[in-house]
Design a protein with these regions (language model features):
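Conserved SAM-binding loop
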Residues: 14-15
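A short glycine-rich, Lys/Arg-flanked "PGG" loop and its adjoining helix->strand segment in the class I
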Residues: 61-76
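Conserved SAM/SAH-binding beta-strand->alpha-helix loop
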Residues: 7-9
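A short SAM/SAH-binding and catalytic strip from SAM-dependent methyltransferases
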Residues: 45-61
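Short alpha-helix
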Residues: 130-154
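Conserved SAM-binding strand-loop segment of SAM-dependent methyltransferases
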Residues: 20-35
């Protein structure tokens, strides 16, 4: 098993978790766009991309090309990600479901300043600048198909594994759903594709 991330801190925590679980994992600290150069082509049976990964990437087409190059023939992409509709919602609004950010991909990132982070920690930071890109469902699926992968599944979900809209969600079995009108907004999706 191989794990790849650009964050030294994330890699350190991942190593601790793997060690405590008794799992052997090779960790590579790198920008995802350099993964093929570091890991080689046609090396993996499975590439897993987790929730929240794509928002850090400016170019989803390039990401899909990297995934396709990493996979062996017959290899599978498994992507569980926050839905672009969720990323476009204004999380500060508590009176209504309202859009506050673009749904479609833009060349320039959205910039956020905050004193918190997505990592569960009690630490308070002075200021954290976050740069994020949203990618619409059509852009993501087209990128995967254009990279030569065959789509085998796409399912939208009414839940996410964190409280994405604070004060407006209820947690059940490790997943958070809107307390009201949960049937109106997709919050995440699962996509699977195979390399022929």
């Amino acid at each position: 098993m191989t794990g790849l991330d650009f964050s030294t801190a994330a890699m350190s925590i991942a190593r601790e978790i793997a060690q405590s679980a008794g799992v052997a994992v090779d960790y590579v600290e790198s920008d995802v766009y350099d993964a093929v150069e570091l890991l080689g082509r046609n090396m993996f049976d499975l590439v897993y991309t987790g929730v929240g990964a794509l928002v850090w990437l400016p170019d989803v087409r390039r990401w899909a090309e990297v995934v396709a190059q990493l996979l062996r023939p017959g290899g599978r992409l498994f992507l569980r990600e926050g839905h672009p509709v969720l990323w476009a919602l204004d999380e500060t609004r508590t009176d209504a479901i309202a859009f506050g950010y673009p749904y479609f991909e833009h060349p320039e990132p959205l910039r956020f300043d905050a004193s918190d982070t997505y990592v569960e920690t009690g630490a308070v930071f002075g200021c954290v600048e976050s740069r994020e890109w949203n990618h619409g469902v059509g852009e993501i699926i087209t990128a995967v198909l254009d990279a030569g992968l065959q789509l085998t599944m796409f399912v939208e979900h009414d839940s996410v594994p964190w409280e994405a809209l604070p004060g407006r969600m209820t947690e059940t079995d490790g997943e958070w759903r809107l307390t009201e009108h949960g049937d109106r907004v997709p919050l995440s999706y699962t996509l699977q594709a195979v390399k022929p």
